[in-house]
A protein has these predicted regions:
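Exported/periplasmic ABC-transporter solute-binding proteins
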Residues: 1-97
Length: 97
């Protein structure tokens, strides 16, 4: 999508933050006349940026013990969140893990 938008001066695209490297981010508002907010780690995690979402992983505690639980715990660890940041997403603050 980014390549298609780059070819058209009038195009607008929407995608995940990890896919937005090298593109111009624009401020958006929840309503007409409302404050336009630029996407950033701070505005996304605070909920101020109006078109962001969390990604969830659902597991069954009774069925997904062991390796799955270890993986989820690693994802929520500082090491796992470092990988999240390395691939272009915003890591969760410790109080949200």
């Amino acid at each position: 999508m980014i390549q298609a938008v780059a070819k058209d001066a009038n195009a607008i695209g929407y995608g995940g933050i990890a896919y937005g490297e090298g593109v111009k981010h624009i401020k958006v508002s929840k309503s007409d006349g409302g404050e336009a907010i630029e996407p950033s780690e701070e505005t996304v995690l605070s909920g101020k940026y109006p078109i962001s979402r969390f990604l969830y992983c659902y597991v069954s505690p009774s069925k997904d013990a062991g390796a799955v639980a270890d993986y989820i715990n690693w994802c929520l660890s500082d090491a796992g969140q470092s990988v999240v940041k390395d691939v272009g997403y915003f890591p969760l603050p410790k109080n949200m893990r």
